[in-house]
A protein has these predicted regions:
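Enzymes that bind and transform nitrogen-containing heteroaromatic metabolites
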Residues: 1-146
Length: 146
């Protein structure tokens, strides 16, 4: 399983339910990287997507605490245990965790790779990712050009 995200210098992810900044090249990287794969996200993250709809060309799995909530074009699960059952048929390399903050916190222990676009600025944020720079469990193995 892989996490995919963009964060500011202080590992900020978002503010008031939105990304801190929209970077076209990062959005393109996200699209190209996740296309044809499984994308796991929370209900609130789904709501921030265009028209609040699942991502086209991907298998969308949405985590929601609301047992009555459904969305067309995605599989909805209500617990990590249920998510793991739904993910059994897929290879770990085909699964991308796309947020939000609570979903990252719950699933980071299952991830072996994190694609992180670090924005060299600090923004007002109310949602954060774990500081991988300070985590002994993570190391940077490759750094991009941008």
């Amino acid at each position: 399983m892989k996490a995919i995200l963009s964060s500011d210098r202080k590992w900020g992810l978002g503010y008031q339910g939105r990304l801190l900044v929209s970077i076209p090249s990062d959005l393109r990287f996200f699209r190209e990287t996740t296309m044809g794969h499984v994308v796991v996200m929370g209900r609130k993250t789904l709501a921030t997507l265009p028209a609040g709809q699942p991502l086209k060309g991907r298998t969308n799995i949405i985590l929601s605490r609301d047992p009555e909530w459904t969305v067309r074009g995605a599989t909805v699960v209500h617990s990590i245990k249920e998510l793991m059952e739904v993910l059994k048929p897929y290879e770990d390399d085909d699964i991308y965790v796309a947020g939000g903050g609570e979903i990252y916190r719950q699933l980071l222990p299952y991830c072996d790779t994190a694609y992180v676009t670090r924005i060299d600025m600090t923004y007002q944020a109310d949602t954060f990712f774990e500081d991988l720079d300070e985590s002994p469990d993570w190391e940077m193995v490759e750094e991009g050009d941008e």
